[in-house]
């Protein structure tokens, strides 16, 4: 997989989920087995806004400088690893239904893919 393809995939995942959380927070939260209240709707929309920002960063990183791309990868490794831990804890505790495992796979893909490009593809970052 190329660096550009990886960024395209994670950008689309973030943007689609972000739009869903902003526009349809009750439905998206319900699909993850979460009860909705005014508070959860607000947090879901804030999460969606953050995902929209991340999606745009990933999209722009497709053509970014190697220093910018490396920084995005490092931030993605950290953020997605923390997200993975949180979603696994929530799913195993029963706070999220089995859709939590889908979110876990998305976080794992982002962290592992970013780690791959940082560790194994450092020359590609400079010669893109």
Predicted features by range, described:
Residues 1-13:
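Cytosolic juxtamembrane helix and N-cap/initiation of the first transmembrane helix
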Residues 2-3, 67-69, 95-98:
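Membrane-helix interface segments
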Residues 12, 16-22, 40-63, 74-85, ...:
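Core segments of alpha-helical transmembrane spans in multipass integral membrane proteins
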Residues 22, 59, 88, 112-118:
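Membrane-embedded alpha-helical segments of multi-pass transporters/permeases
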Residues 26-38, 90-96:
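Membrane-interface helix termini and inter-helical loops of multi-pass transporters
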Residues 57-69, 91-92:
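Juxtamembrane helix-break-helix junctions at the cytosolic face
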Residues 63, 85-102, 119:
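Membrane-helix boundary connector in multi-pass membrane proteins
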Residues 109-128:
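Membrane-water interface at the C-terminal end of transmembrane alpha helices
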């Amino acid at each position: 997989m190329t660096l550009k393809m990886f960024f395209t995939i994670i950008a689309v995942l973030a943007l689609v989920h972000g739009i869903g959380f902003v526009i349809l927070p009750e439905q998206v939260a319900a699909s993850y087995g979460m009860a909705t209240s005014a508070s959860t709707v607000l947090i879901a929309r804030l999460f969606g806004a953050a995902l929209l920002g991340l999606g745009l960063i990933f999209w722009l990183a497709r053509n970014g400088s190697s220093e910018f791309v490396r920084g995005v990868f490092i931030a993605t490794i950290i953020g997605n690893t923390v997200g993975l831990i949180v979603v696994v804890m929530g799913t195993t505790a029963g706070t999220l239904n089995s859709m939590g495992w889908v979110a876990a796979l998305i976080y794992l893909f982002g962290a592992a893919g970013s780690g791959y490009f940082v560790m194994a593809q450092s020359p590609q970052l400079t010669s893109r």
